[in-house]
Amino acid sequence: MTNYAIILAAGKGTRMTSDLPKVLHKVSGLTMLEHVFRSVKAISPEKAVTVIGHKSEKVRAVLADQSAFVHQTEQLGTGHAVMMAETQLEGLEGHTLVIAGDTPLITGESLKSLIDFHVNHKNVATILTATAQDPFGYGRIVRNKDGEVIKIVEQKDANEYEQQLKEINTGTYVFDNKRLFEALKCITTNNAQGEYYLTDVVAIFRANKEKVGAYILRDFNESLGVNDRVALATAETVMRQRITQKHMVNGVTFQNPETVYIESDVEIAPDVLIEGNVTLKGRTHIGSGTVLTNGTYIVDSEIGQGSIITNSMIESSVLAAGVTVGPYAHLRPGTTLDREVHIGNFVEVKGSHIGEKTKAGHLTYIGNAQVGSSVNVGAGTITVNYDGQNKYETVIGDHAFIGSNSTLIAPLEVGDNALTAAGSTISKTVPADSIVIGRSRQVTKEGYAKRLAHHPSRSK
């Protein structure tokens, strides 16, 4: 059995009120087109053809070499859009899935079941349908007394009886490939919209006494087509619920799943605890036994097993096992933390590698640095890495002790086991096993305070 796919992605999406093509709006971190294409791959199409139009280069860039593309210059209806794919699929034997690129909730399992139903029933066309509590706006499935599909009627063309029908057309179909393009040559624009309706091929097949069937979705949510921001928000809500439920089934605990945002490509190992208001985005991986507390935000990062992240932001970073971060820490892109590193409150790390068991407990900036293992970085330490034009590196050896309020002016190297005195400004190399003091000597002038305006004696 050879399968093909046509994805309709040419529309502008006027009701989205956006410069972005409709299919490129995102749901849980992926464009709607990407969601649809991932589901389409479940039927293993020998060729996928995407019909593009509005801002076509942006749409093409999303799928790149995963799909062939055809251009629909004028949007003259769904039938016209499918006609554009004939140059890619003409004369081929097999079954062709036609699906809209704005249906992000459709699953690969449903599409595979649709194809199997189509093949097993030897249909020339199979419509993916759903039962709607409120069918207004959808095309209706009209059956005869024997339950056979006889036609699909659009909302604007439906009579009073047809408008009461609850079974709706989802806009997804499977056709015999050759018969599809033969039938498309017979459709017209004689309808309320003045467009080429793809649905008209059903009546053509019926007139030729060819078999047309309908496969009913079990979950109506999968049929959602996104035409405006309201529907986009609905799709986001449904997708978010799916994602959290998947992770819960796989052993992840959510204290308040309704408040958590997790994107589609995030991976979470079993026995992770996630509190409320946590955001996980991009290609993030969370290791087993990790705890993510309220307010944590992580994007494109790897968190090692058994770590604790407390109300902190982590971007494009790699953390080994047993790391503790936060509260209120910020790990910026290019940060690597080895095992059992502690990054405390109000610490920012950027573009740096920090060795195992090193601690930076509070109020510190570490940028463009290589920090060894078992280093203590005192409160208020700053690596001065930028001179207004260039960035420079700071290197700190193993077991070094950086005193509180140290200012390390890069480029700089602090050797193994070295110690910087609190309040020091260091601009030259510190050899291993050395103590460096880079501050002014304290001068005490007894009784001088009485001469100053703030002294109580001055107010008398």
Swiss-Prot record:
Region (Pyrophosphorylase): 1-229
Signal peptide residue numbers: none
Class of enzymatic activity (EC top level): transferase
Residue numbers spanned by region Linker: 230-250
Main location: cytoplasm
Binding site for acetyl-CoA: 379, 385-386, 404, 422, 439
InterPro entries: Bifunctional_GlmU, GlmU-like, GlmU_C_LbH, Hexapep, NTP_transferase_dom, Nucleotide-diphossugar_trans, Trimer_LpxA-like_sf
Cofactor note: Binds 1 Mg(2+) ion per subunit.
Protein name: Bifunctional protein GlmU
Protein source organism: Streptococcus pyogenes serotype M5 (strain Manfredo)
Name of the gene this protein is made from: glmU
